[in-house]
Amino acid sequence: MANTKSAKKFIIKSKKNRNRNLSNRSMLKTFIKKVNIAINKRNISEALFAFKNMQKCIDRQSIKGLIHKNKAARCKSKIFRRISLLIN
């Protein structure tokens, strides 16, 4: 258990950050699932719209440091490859 006042404050801060990170990670997964569902339905317009929203979310989270920028690039590339196969 924390002994000093600053250590107690740090515990509170880390709990807040953890909850925020869990929420943001969950939101990110939801956006990715929406794109995958649209791709599986073979709905191009819905997939492109969902991809656009997912891309914004991924970029935002990578800037904030929730995920690494290379992982963000990999994820966007992987999903866009699937969409382009659907278009062609």
From Swiss-Prot:
Keywords: Ribonucleoprotein, Ribosomal protein, RNA-binding, rRNA-binding. GO terms for molecular function: small ribosomal subunit rRNA binding; structural constituent of ribosome. The keyword RNA-binding applies. InterPro entries: Ribosomal_bS20, Ribosomal_bS20_sf. SUPFAM superfamilies: Ribosomal protein S20. It holds the Pfam family Ribosomal_S20p. One of its GO terms (biological process) is translation. One of its GO terms (cellular component) is small ribosomal subunit. Binds directly to 16S ribosomal RNA. Belongs to the bacterial ribosomal protein bS20 family. NCBIfam families: S20. HAMAP family: Ribosomal_bS20 (MF_00500). This is Small ribosomal subunit protein bS20. The gene is rpsT.
